[in-house]
């Protein structure tokens, strides 16, 4: 919340909260609750999900939740959506209460969300209330070229995670621009680039924060649990 307030004072436009599960160093497992708390303690900055991992939720649940947020905080909510589970297979199985399998249809889930957020004429037997006529902005998140095709086909904004796949960013952007189809949401492509950055009062402190993040990446690759270390004298050895 403190960081969101600082960014709001600096006139930043949006602040996003991720969805991750079974990570001790990450507290954003209940994404919508954190978003609501930040919205309640700020005045104008847009706050959203970066993002909701659709395999973990039904479109109806997502539409009800974010339709409620949009009703409480009009024009301040973003709904970024992704196709990954945001966790390991074992944890995903517990979320599903069955063996995890990539069985959901990402594009169909997004189309269903658009219907739930749309007008009365677009609704079916089941409605998301509140949600109707809220038109919550949907942004496609991804770290691969496949998500670029989806965003382009649906004419939606696209946010690429370069902190996960920096080598694919240029290709993904090219695909999105080349295949983009205008929609009722966008006349032209809208691309957001997510980058990893560390800021501090001094260069030394920023460097220290950066090395902590690097250590966290190493621990993730090694499938090590626990909080990130604040300092590691063997960092260079581990990096090699």
What are the functions of these language-model segments?
Residues 148-167, 172-173, 177:
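A conserved active-site cap/scaffold subdomain adjacent to cofactor or substrate pockets
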Residues 1, 55-118, 158, 166:
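Flexible, glycine-rich active-site loops centered on histidine and acidic residues
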Residues 7, 11, 19, 38, ...:
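Conserved, mostly hydrophobic/aromatic
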Residues 23-24, 48-56:
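The substrate-binding groove and active-site-proximal loops of carbohydrate-active enzymes
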Residues 1-45:
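N-terminal beta1-alpha1-beta2 module of alpha/beta enzyme domains
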């Amino acid at each position: 919340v403190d960081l969101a307030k600082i960014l709001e004072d600096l006139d930043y436009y949006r602040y996003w909260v991720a969805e991750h599960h079974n990570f001790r160093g990450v507290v954003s497992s209940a994404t919508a609750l954190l978003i609501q708390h930040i919205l309640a303690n700020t005045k104008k900055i847009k706050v959203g999900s970066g993002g909701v991992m659709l395999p973990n939720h039904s479109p109806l649940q997502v539409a009800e939740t974010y339709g409620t947020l949009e009703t409480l905080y009009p024009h301040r909510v973003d709904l970024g959506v992704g196709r990954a589970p945001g966790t390991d297979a074992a944890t995903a199985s517990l979320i599903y209460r069955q063996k995890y399998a990539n069985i959901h249809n990402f594009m169909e889930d997004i189309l269903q969300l658009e219907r739930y957020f749309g007008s009365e004429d677009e609704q079916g037997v089941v409605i998301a209330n509140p949600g109707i006529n809220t038109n919550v902005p949907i942004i496609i998140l991804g770290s691969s070229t496949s998500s670029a095709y989806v965003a382009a086909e649906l004419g939606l904004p696209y946010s690429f995670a370069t902190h996960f796949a920096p080598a694919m960013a240029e290709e993904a952007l090219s695909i999105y621009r080349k295949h983009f189809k205008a929609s009722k949401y966008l006349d032209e492509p809208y691309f957001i680039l997510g980058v990893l950055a560390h800021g501090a009062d001094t260069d030394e402190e920023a460097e220290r924060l950066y090395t902590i993040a690097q250590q966290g990446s190493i621990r993730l690759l090694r499938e090590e649990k626990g909080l990130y270390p604040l300092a590691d004298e063997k960092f260079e050895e581990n990096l090699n």
